[in-house]
């Protein structure tokens, strides 16, 4: 037998740690004669207990399974908490690397109250801190900076995200760099969608190359740029050409400066703070500050001497009243809003905003404008009133739309024109027109268009229980009561006969004494034909009725076929001015010479003539 197993590797799990190959040696003796001997011997053998016929025993397999499951569970927990574990093999490679930690190492609480005077512990802490700082600096110096700048920016963002309050950290960095608080220069916008032209922006850890490039790239977006770089903070004052929201400003700067949103703070500047304006004005003279463009108006207002003198102008109520009168503003909300918008260009409006009695001024202004308008209306004839209202109508229309609609309702236009002439001149017992008929015939559309162009008033009978529901009749040249029902006809028949006769009536006014007036021309629409009602026989001579029997027509696009617009009525009055017996405005205007508009302000001594 020979040993040929040298250098052969075997599986250690195959029972034995060693393996032997036994090779039998051949014998010349034949076994043919010994076969009988072999059979006679049978199952006899010299080896005892070669085969184990006893029952098998399970052994300790359950313990083995528990050990395997425990090892697997510990491995999973280790993977989940791997950032809290350190590999001993890696730490043993370098003691210096082992001393560096990202998270702060807090002292054990049991040593907080260790008995000591404090001097020795202070020295120990100082030595430990110095040693740790030196080791970190040495490792940083020995290491090479990453080539990828994106990785550096990502590291800055991660450092910011580790802070519990990123905004507070940026505000502290800003005050440390510029010596003034960021919120002292700005006012706060709660919503990121509110638009403003001027924005104060500060950024953290921006590359110098990108800051230099932004000076040119922002020129196309801004009328004024103010820039100062005090590492690691950078401060911008950007006056955009158009209003932008905070979201839009963030997207623009993130694209130009390659920064994350967490690195940016943006708020609009304080426009009325003199200290804030001086910060930007004096800062622009600093050689380290880049400024491009003309100063914004709000900086000029706070810093220049001529603007300061204009700021001292006292508020003049008559100027505000003149503005509201010229622009036909009667309601208090319209006066307040539109006059406040003039603060950028008008010194008196700016003084109005700085006054503490704005609400009182608005009420008094609206009251005075109503007084002037009422006096002007009473001084005008119906011809002058119609001419004045037609002057403000822009665009061109055609008078034939009115004529065609009247004829479409089977009304003789010559008769309608004659009645309409008496109606406009407020002739007694002819100053009330009724348009009746079934629904959807255009009654309200026709009368509302006339009321709109002549700036008339609409009365609602729903308020008839109030003593003042007829008060608008004192402030108009023409009025309308739409959709008159039986109840309203009964009220007119009982209480308004004298008014329809053209006589003076006593009208109750709110917060004022009752006044004596004549009713202006009155338009009525109804679904009832009172001419066939015997109970209203006393109104037959006071009301002129026209029937609208046909439904108002619409084309295939659901648009009206008759254009009852302001332009159509303007063309109608211009075309039929003489037929309506309206006076010539050149005669009333002193042979066509221009008349000076109403002036409710005192002329300045050195003013223009």
UniProtKB/Swiss-Prot annotation:
It catalyses: Couples ATP hydrolysis with the unwinding of duplex DNA by translocating in the 3'-5' direction; ATP + H2O = ADP + phosphate + H(+). The modification Phosphoserine is found at residues 87, 94. InterPro entries: Helicase_SF3_DNA-vir, P-loop_NTPase, PPV_DNA_helicase_E1_C, PPV_DNA_helicase_E1_N, PPV_E1_DBD, PPV_E1_DBD_sf, Rep_E1_papillomaV, Znf_lg_T-Ag_D1_dom_sf. Residues 584-609 are annotated as: Disordered. Its main location: host cell. Signal peptide: none annotated. One of its GO terms (molecular function) is ATP hydrolysis activity. The lineage of its organism: Viruses, Monodnaviria, Shotokuvirae, Cossaviricota, Papovaviricetes. Phosphorylated. Belongs to the papillomaviridae E1 protein family. Residues 411-561 form the SF3 helicase domain. ATP-dependent DNA 3'-5' helicase required for initiation of viral DNA replication. It forms a complex with the viral E2 protein. The E1-E2 complex binds to the replication origin which contains binding sites for both proteins. During the initial step, a dimer of E1 interacts with a dimer of protein E2 leading to a complex that binds the viral origin of replication with high specificity. Then, a second dimer of E1 displaces the E2 dimer in an ATP-dependent manner to form the E1 tetramer. Keywords: ATP-binding, DNA replication, DNA-binding, Early protein, Helicase, Host nucleus, Hydrolase, Isomerase, Isopeptide bond, Nucleotide-binding, Phosphoprotein, Ubl conjugation. One of its GO terms (biological process) is DNA replication. This is Replication protein E1. Can form hexamers. Interacts with E2 protein; this interaction increases E1 DNA binding specificity. Interacts with host DNA polymerase subunit POLA2. Interacts with host single stranded DNA-binding protein RPA1. Interacts with host TOP1; this interaction stimulates the enzymatic activity of TOP1. A motif (Nuclear export signal) lies at residues 93-102. Pfam families: PPV_E1_C (PF00519), PPV_E1_DBD (PF20450), PPV_E1_N (PF00524). Transmembrane segments: none annotated. GO terms for cellular component: host cell nucleus. It is found in: Host nucleus. A motif (Nuclear localization signal) lies at residues 81-83. PROSITE patterns: SF3_HELICASE_1 (PS51206). SUPFAM superfamilies: Origin of replication-binding domain, RBD-like, P-loop containing nucleoside triphosphate hydrolases.
């Amino acid at each position: 037998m020979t040993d040929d197993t040298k250098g052969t590797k075997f599986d250690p799990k195959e029972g034995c740690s060693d393996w032997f190959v036994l090779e039998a040696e051949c014998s010349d003796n034949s076994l043919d004669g010994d076969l009988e001997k072999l059979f006679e011997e049978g199952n006899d053998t010299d080896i005892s207990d070669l085969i184990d016929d006893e029952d098998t025993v399970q052994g300790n397999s359950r313990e083995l399974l528990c050990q395997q499951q425990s090892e697997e569970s510990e491995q999973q927990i280790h993977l989940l908490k791997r950032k809290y574990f350190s590999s001993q093999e890696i730490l043993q490679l370098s003691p210096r690397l082992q001393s560096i930690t990202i998270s702060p190492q807090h002292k054990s609480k049991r040593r907080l109250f260790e008995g000591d005077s404090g001097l020795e512990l202070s020295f120990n802490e100082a030595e430990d801190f110095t040693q740790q700082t030196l080791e970190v600096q040495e490792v940083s110096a020995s290491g090479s900076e990453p080539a990828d700048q994106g990785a550096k920016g990502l590291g800055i963002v991660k450092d910011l995200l580790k802070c519990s309050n990123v905004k507070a950290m940026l505000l502290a960095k800003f005050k440390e760099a510029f010596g003034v608080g960021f919120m002292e220069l700005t006012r706060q916008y709660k919503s990121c969608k509110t638009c403003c032209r001027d924005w104060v922006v500060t950024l953290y850890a921006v590359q110098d190359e990108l800051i230099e490039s932004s000076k040119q790239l922002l020129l196309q977006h801004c009328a004024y740029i103010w820039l100062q770089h005090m590492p690691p903070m950078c401060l911008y004052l950007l006056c955009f050409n158009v209003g932008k929201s905070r979201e839009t400003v963030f997207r623009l700067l993130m694209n130009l400066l390659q920064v994350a949103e967490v690195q940016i703070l943006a708020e609009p500047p304080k426009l009325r703070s003199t200290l804030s304006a001086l910060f930007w004005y004096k800062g622009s003279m600093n050689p380290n500050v880049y400024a491009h463009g003309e100063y914004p108006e709000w900086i000029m207002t706070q810093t220049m001497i001529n603007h300061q003198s204009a700021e001292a102008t006292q508020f003049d109520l008559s100027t505000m009243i003149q503005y509201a009168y010229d622009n036909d503003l009667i309601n208090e909300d319209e006066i307040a809003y539109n006059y406040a918008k003039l603060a950028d260009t008008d010194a008196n409006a700016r003084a109005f905003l700085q006054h503490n009695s704005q609400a009182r001024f608005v009420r008094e202004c609206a009251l005075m404008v109503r007084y002037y308008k009422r006096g002007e209306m009473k001084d005008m004839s119906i011809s002058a009133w119609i001419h004045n209202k037609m002057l403000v109508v822009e665009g061109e229309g055609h008078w034939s739309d009115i004529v065609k609609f009247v004829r479409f309702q089977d009304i003789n236009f010559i008769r309608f024109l004659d009645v309409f002439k008496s109606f406009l001149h407020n002739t007694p017992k002819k100053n009330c027109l009724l348009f009746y008929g079934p629904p959807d015939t255009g009654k309200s559309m026709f009368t509302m268009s006339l009321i709109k162009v002549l700036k008339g008033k609409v009365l609602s009978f729903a308020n008839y229980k109030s003593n003042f529901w007829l008060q608008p009749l004192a402030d108009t040249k023409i009025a309308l009561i739409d959709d008159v029902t039986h109840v309203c006809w009964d009220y007119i028949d009982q209480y308004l006969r004298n008014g329809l006769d053209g006589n003076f009536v006593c009208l109750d006014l709110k917060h004022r004494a009752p006044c004596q007036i004549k009713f202006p021309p009155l338009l009525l629409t109804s679904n009832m034909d009172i001419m066939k009602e015997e109970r209203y026989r006393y109104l037959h001579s006071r009301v002129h009725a026209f029937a609208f029997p046909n439904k108002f027509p619409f084309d295939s696009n659901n648009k009206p076929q008759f254009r009852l617009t302001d332009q159509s009525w303007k063309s109608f009055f211009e075309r039929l001015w003489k037929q309506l017996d309206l006076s010539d405005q050149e005669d009333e205007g002193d042979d066509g010479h221009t008349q000076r508009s109403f002036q409710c302000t005192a002329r300045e001594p050195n003013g223009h003539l």
